[in-house]
Amino acid sequence: MWEPYMPVEPGLGREENFLSLEDLLMSQEKLPCCIESGFPRLGFLDKGGDSDSIPEGSKMELPLWLAKGLYDNKRRVLSVELPKIYREGWRTVFSADANVVDLHKMGPHYYGFGSQLLNFDSPENPEIAKTILQTFVGRFRRIMDSSQNAYNEDTSGLVARLDELERSLFRAGQRGLNAFQSWERGKAAQITASNLVQNYKKRKFNEADA
């Protein structure tokens, strides 16, 4: 099938891939911040203010890419407040049963955005990282089982609740199932490795060369 652009995989962990459309969209998501040092002549960033500067102590939401660019742990230019889905209350919900949460409604880039939060110095970072990993592990099996066992069924209800990373995994699982079904019917000459496996091998090869 023809695609309007060549898909590029999102970055891994705290690294972003600015050739990835998904990472670009994620970097536009807003992050609640508190200004620790006044910003002269940047009042236009605060749509609710009427000053040409942003005074110290102001609270505002900044795009992730801008918050990362301004953040400096030594100078304390700004501090970051955790979005509610990454706070302790929601971490408790995820640890109880991550499958009940509508991740797309809470944050379409839950895993990627949460990984980016680790760039900011927070005492809760270890717990955030732990919850993100446990959530992924807890939901992964159900997602892949559904992608393999819902052949020709309506999966829109399930997919609507998935984070963007989970949606890509679900689609990869269905593509693999379709390829296997075609192979069984003799419509494919051979089974090839999935794009995820091929990209992983390329990354490992490049790391070995480096």
UniProtKB/Swiss-Prot annotation:
Functional note: Required for correct functioning of the GINS complex, a complex that plays an essential role in the initiation of DNA replication, and progression of DNA replication forks. GINS complex is a core component of CDC45-MCM-GINS (CMG) helicase, the molecular machine that unwinds template DNA during replication, and around which the replisome is built.
Species assigned in the record: Xenopus laevis
One GO BP annotation of this record: mitotic DNA replication initiation
Keyword ATP-binding part of the UniProt annotation: no
Family listed: Belongs to the GINS3/PSF3 family.
Gene Ontology CC terms, in alphabetical order: CMG complex; GINS complex
UniProt keyword terms in alphabetical order: Chromosome, DNA replication, Nucleus
InterPro entries, per database record: GINS_A, GINS_bundle-like_dom_sf, GINS_Psf3, GINS_Psf3_sf, PSF3_N
GO molecular function: chromatin binding
The protein's name: DNA replication complex GINS protein PSF3
Pfam families registered for this protein in UniProt: PSF3_N, Sld5
Subunit organization: Component of the GINS complex which is a heterotetramer of gins1/psf1, gins2/psf2, gins3/psf3 and gins4/sld5. Component of the CMG helicase complex, composed of the mcm2-7 complex, the GINS complex and cdc45.
Compartment(s) where it occurs, according to its Swiss-Prot or TrEMBL record: Nucleus; Chromosome
